[in-house]
């Protein structure tokens, strides 16, 4: 074989080696469960914000609805049930598979219920229905995250997290776009009922692939003490690690600014006079593709730079991206401006979605996957959601959108500094769980 032929063959192998991990069954499973994970969030997030704003509900009331997201932040309280309680009859399908089916049906029922409410006639029942969707979506997320982490091998966490984020964004974007288009042509009830079908990809994936290979069957426990240990065990194990409290502090503060900015975004766009079609094209459409590109770049950064450096880069980009909303608010209605702003923000979020989720997944102990990841993911946005639901609306009304988004940029700085410091003193590696190759796990995961 000539030198040129060898070079071409080598380049082809290199290209295939780069693409191949995305087509492994574990990565594809992460993608499809991610689709179903994303859509309930959209149903009580930007989509519901738009629906309420168009119904003339006040800003303070609309932002108060984001408290429904706090249910996601409390999911660690019942995540132990998903880890340790075996369902009767259907449980023969496997612990994760059976819970995936039950949680999926719960989500579909809750979304259909929210479809039937009239916010103008009964705002209290609308709020209750949104909370029910939050509870169902949070339970679905517990199962989905555990299924993803236990399906992926340690070396697949980067690619798998990327595929999960691809799926999450497609699910949330599809739900948002479908809801906007159908609501503009029919009504919000039809829009929400159509979106309920997005629970099916995760349910079908679990049925087809079956139980994750790394899942450890629940241990039969009897008595009060044994039951208490089943609940407390995952938390005790996590906090016994070196630097666990600092890791938790980072999880709590790293995303405050990003959470605040995103949950108020649709209010900004509504006040700037953007139509549903403009939002669908320039916000949802451009943002969608920018996010996908960001996910790809995030996967490259993770594989080339390792976990610590790639996470630090992502944190800086996500913090700076919020400042672009202050620029948009200052210059006023502009479709190109909205496209550029959403492009930058979603590109940054795509990178962060891969590397930060990979880091959080690696923190889990495989004995307590559902409970520990529920704790980590819930803590990641609880502060931002609490501030949004209690004071964000008043902050916008008192200080204006420009100053509000400058504030969200500034409060991203502590999380960046904390992660940099933990990397310098070795706490990132010391706190790693078995899912990421720590302790008795596979040490090949890039840190």
Task: Please tell me what each predicted stretch does.
Residues 102-108, 190-208, 403-421:
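Symmetry-related core transmembrane helices of the 12-TM Major Facilitator Superfamily/SLC fold
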Residues 99-120, 316-333:
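C-terminal ends and interior cores of transmembrane alpha-helices
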Residues 138-152, 351-365, 375:
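Intracellular juxtamembrane helix-capping segments at the cytosolic ends
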Residues 75-92, 293-310, 396-397:
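Helix-to-loop junctions at the C-terminal end of transmembrane segments
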Residues 72-75, 158-177, 183, 377-388:
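Glycine-rich segments within core transmembrane alpha-helices of 12-TM secondary carriers
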């Amino acid at each position: 074989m000539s030198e040129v032929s060898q070079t071409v063959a080598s380049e082809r192998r290199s290209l295939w080696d780069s693409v191949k991990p995305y087509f492994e069954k574990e990565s594809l499973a992460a993608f499809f469960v991610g689709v179903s994970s994303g859509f309930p969030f959209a149903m009580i997030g930007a989509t519901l914000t738009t629906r309420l704003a168009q119904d003339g509900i006040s800003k303070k009331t609309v932002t108060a609805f984001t408290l429904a997201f706090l249910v996601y932040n409390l999911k660690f309280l019942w995540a132990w049930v998903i880890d340790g309680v075996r369902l009767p009859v259907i449980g023969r399908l496997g612990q994760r598979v059976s819970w995936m089916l039950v949680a999926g049906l719960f989500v579909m029922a809750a979304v259909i219920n929210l479809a039937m409410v009239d916010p103008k006639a009964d705002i209290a029942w609308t709020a209750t229905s949104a909370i029910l969707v939050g509870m169902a979506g949070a339970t679905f997320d517990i199962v989905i995250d555990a299924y993803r982490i236990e399906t992926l091998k340690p070396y697949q966490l980067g690619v798998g997290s990327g595929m999960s984020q691809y799926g999450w964004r497609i699910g949330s974007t599809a739900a948002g776009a479908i809801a906007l288009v159908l609501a503009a042509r029919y009504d919000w009830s039809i829009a929400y009922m159509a979106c309920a079908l997005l629970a099916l990809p995760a349910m079908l994936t679990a049925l087809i692939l079956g139980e994750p290979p790394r899942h450890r069957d629940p241990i039969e426990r009897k008595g009060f003490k044994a039951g208490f240990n089943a609940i407390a065990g995952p938390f005790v194990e996590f906090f016994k690690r070196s630097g666990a409290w600092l890791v938790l502090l980072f999880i709590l503060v790293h995303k405050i600014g990003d959470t605040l900015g995103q949950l108020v975004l649709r209010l900004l766009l509504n006040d700037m006079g953007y139509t549903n079609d403009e939002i669908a094209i320039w916000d949802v459409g451009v943002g969608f593709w920018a996010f996908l590109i960001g996910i790809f770049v995030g996967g490259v950064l993770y594989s080339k730079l390792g976990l610590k450096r790639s996470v630090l880069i992502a944190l800086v980009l996500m913090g700076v991206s919020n400042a672009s909303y202050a620029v948009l608010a200052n210059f006023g209605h502009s479709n190109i401006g909205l496209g550029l702003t959403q492009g930058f923000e979603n590109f940054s979020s795509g990178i962060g979605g891969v590397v930060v989720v990979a880091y959080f997944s690696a923190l889990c102990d495989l004995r307590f996957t559902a409970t520990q990841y529920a704790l980590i993911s819930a803590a990641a946005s609880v502060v931002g959601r609490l501030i949004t639901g209690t004071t964000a609306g008043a902050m916008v009304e008192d200080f204006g959108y420009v100053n509000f988004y400058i504030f969200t940029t500034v409060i991203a700085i502590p999380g960046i500094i904390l992660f940099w410091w933990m990397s310098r003193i070795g706490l990132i590696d010391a706190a790693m769980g078995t899912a990421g190759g720590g302790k008795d796990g596979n040490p090949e995961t890039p840190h």
